[in-house]
C-alpha cells in the first residue's frame, strides 16, 4: 500500500510560522521549486523512519521534529515534515481499512465544522487595491455541512451576478475568491451584504461576514493602512473597525493587527468580549 500528501503554501506568512523550504537558487522554477525538500524526504527522513510502525503517528512526528531540531522546522522544512506526516496518517487508515477521519481520537458523533468561504480576495492575494486580504462568509444557520455548502454556493453565485452588474471583472485571486478592481473595503462589504440579501438570507443571522485582514502587510511605524491607503494611528484604526463591525455585523476578524502588536489586539478584543479581571489590568 502507499499514500500521497501535499502541503499548502501561502502568499503572506508571519514571522513565527513554520519554514517552507524552497530552492531559492534554482533558476528553472524562479526559486520556487521544492527539489531539495523532496530529496530530504527520500534520504534523511526516509532513513530515520524506516522500520517504524505506520500506526504510531506521534512517534513518526516526533522523530522528524527531533531530526530537524529547530523551532520553525528550518532544516528539513515544514513542507517536507508535514507531507510525510499526512501521508503516514493516510497510509495508516488504508492499512486499517477505515476512512481517514475515523483514525483520530473522536470515536463517535463525528461532525464537520461549518466552512468560512473566502469570496472576495484583496491584499497579497489579489492586485485590486483592496486593503483587507480575505472577505469571507459563514453559514451560521445551516442544518448540515451539505446545507452550508449550498448556502455559500448560492451567495457566491449571486455575488458574481452583482459584480458583473457593476461592470467589474469576476476574475479570481490566489485563494479562489473574486478579485474585482475595487479599492474600498466598504464597497466589497456592500456587495457581500447585497448578495446575502439577494439569496434570501439575513446578514448577521443566517449568514455572517468574517474577515482576514493580514494586518502585518499594512503596518508601518506603529500605524496602519487597513481602512484606506493612508496610515493612521491604532486608536483611529480601532474606531474604523468599530464602524464596519457594527454596520456590516462582522462576526470574526483574523489578524486585525500586526503579529507582535498585542496591545492593539487587546484594545479591540476588550470592546467586544467580557474581560477577565486580569485583562482589565
Predicted regions and their residues:
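Short, mixed charged/polar active-site loops
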Residues: 2-4
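Metal-dependent enolase-superfamily TIM-barrel catalytic cores that perform enediolate-based chemistry
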Residues: 126-271
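Metal- or metallocofactor-binding catalytic centers and their adjacent structured scaffolds
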Residues: 8-94, 98, 149
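Single conserved hydrophobic/aromatic residue that forms the stacking wall/gate
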Residues: 272-281
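Structural signal for hydrophobic packing residues in well-ordered secondary-structure cores
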Residues: 42, 46-53, 64, 68-72, ...
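Glycine-rich, aromatic-flanked loop segments that form ligand/cofactor-binding clefts
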Residues: 109-121, 202-213
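Conserved phosphate/anionic-ligand binding catalytic regions in large, soluble enzymes, centered on
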Residues: 73-93, 114-130, 174-177
Amino acid at each position: 500500500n502507499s499514500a500521497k500528501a501535499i502541503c499548502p503554501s501561502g502568499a503572506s506568512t508571519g514571522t513565527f510560522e513554520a519554514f517552507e523550504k524552497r530552492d531559492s537558487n534554482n533558476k528553472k522554477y524562479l526559486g520556487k521549486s521544492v527539489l531539495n525538500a523532496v530529496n530530504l524526504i527520500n534520504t534523511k527522513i526516509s532513513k530515520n523512519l524506516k522500520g517504524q510502525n505506520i500506526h504510531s503517528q506521534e512517534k513518526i512526528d516526533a522523530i522528524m521534529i527531533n531530526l530537524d531540531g529547530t523551532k520553525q522546522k528550518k532544516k528539513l522544512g515544514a513542507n517536507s515534515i508535514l507531507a510525510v506526516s499526512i501521508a503516514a496518517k493516510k497510509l495508516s487508515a488504508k492499512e486499517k481499512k477505515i476512512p481517514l477521519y475515523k483514525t483520530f481520537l473522536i470515536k463517535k458523533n463525528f461532525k464537520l465544522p461549518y466552512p468560512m468561504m473566502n469570496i472576495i480576495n484583496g491584499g497579497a492575494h489579489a492586485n485590486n487595491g483592496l486593503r483587507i486580504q480575505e472577505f469571507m462568509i459563514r453559514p451560521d444557520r445551516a442544518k448540515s455541512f451539505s446545507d452550508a455548502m449550498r448556502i455559500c454556493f448560492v451567495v457566491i453565485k449571486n455575488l458574481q451576478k452583482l459584480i458583473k452588474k457593476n461592470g467589474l471583472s469576476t476574475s479570481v485571486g490566489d485563494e479562489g475568491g473574486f478579485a474585482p478592481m475595487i479599492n474600498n473595503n466598504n464597497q466589497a462589504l456592500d456587495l457581500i451584504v447585497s448578495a446575502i440579501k439577494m439569496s434570501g438570507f439575513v446578514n448577521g443571522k443566517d449568514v455572517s461576514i468574517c474577515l482576514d485582514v493580514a494586518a502585518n502587510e499594512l503596518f508601518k511605524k506603529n500605524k496602519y493602512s487597513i481602512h484606506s491607503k493612508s496610515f493612521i494611528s491604532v486608536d483611529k484604526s480601532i474606531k474604523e473597525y468599530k464602524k464596519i463591525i457594527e454596520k456590516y455585523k462582522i462576526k470574526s476578524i483574523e489578524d486585525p493587527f500586526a503579529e507582535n502588536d498585542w496591545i492593539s489586539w487587546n484594545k479591540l478584543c476588550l470592546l467586544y468580549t467580557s474581560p477577565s479581571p486580569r485583562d482589565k489590568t
